[in-house]
Swiss-Prot record:
It comes from the Bacteria. It comes from Endomicrobium trichonymphae. GO terms for molecular function: DNA binding; zinc ion binding. Belongs to the RecR family. This is Recombination protein RecR. Keywords: DNA damage, DNA recombination, DNA repair, Metal-binding, Zinc, Zinc-finger.
């Protein structure tokens, strides 16, 4: 027996989320159907509210309710150092490290030739414009330690060095192939402290 068409449509939409396969999408769909209507309404409202209120910071491209975001607006932060991350989730992970007091830039992804993601598909041009405009002395590249993150790091380092800006990469402590957003605060803190010049 086939699933009813409305359930099939839910499964098709939910499995488009990152990390959600067909079976998980099916479980989530049936779970949502069993939820009390008030909970379903709250879920829908929270999604719509987040979509409506969240903005991309015009300076760092982080998601925020305000533009500029609270980090870019914080006058106590070091304005001459920028940590470049792939996603807002990575920014949140690094920002939990109290040792780092600089600013951020969210690329919105990583270079991936196999997936046809090139420099024009992420915010590299916007980053370079910011680096030319602001008085930045150092860029910490905090992309993931997988092949996409490494390709992105090398590409960025080559471009940024031409601007005469010091480029460093997070030091050891992050597992090869690992995502920054899943690393604990101590690991990220050690990686920042042990960053290497590129």
């Amino acid at each position: 027996m086939n699933r009813p068409r409305p359930v099939e449509k839910m499964v098709g939409i939910i499995k488009k989320l990152p990390g959600v396969g067909h079976k998980m999408a099916e479980r989530l769909s049936y779970h949502i159907l069993k939820m009390p209507q008030v909970e379903v309404d709250r879920l829908i409202d929270s999604i719509q509210n987040a979509r409506r209120t969240m903005k991309c910071c015009s300076i760092c491209c982080n998601l925020s309710e305000h533009d500029p975001c609270p980090i870019c607006s914080d006058v106590t932060r070091e304005k001459n150092i920028v940590c470049v991350v792939e996603t807002p989730q990575d920014l949140i992970a690094v920002s939990k490290v109290e040792d780092y007091k600089g600013l951020y830039f969210v690329l919105g992804g990583a270079l991936s030739p196999l997936d046809a993601v090139g420099p024009d598909d992420i915010r590299i041009d916007k980053l370079i414009k910011r680096l030319k405009r602001d008085s930045i002395n150092e860029v910490i590249i905090a992309t993931d330690a997988d092949s996409k993150g490494e390709i992105t790091a090398v590409y960025l380092a080559d471009i940024i060095k031409i601007l005469g800006i010091k480029v460093t990469r997070l030091g050891y402590g992050l597992p090869v192939g690992g995502d920054i957003e899943y690393a604990d605060e101590i690991t990220i803190s050690r990686a920042i402290a042990g960053r290497k010049e590129m």
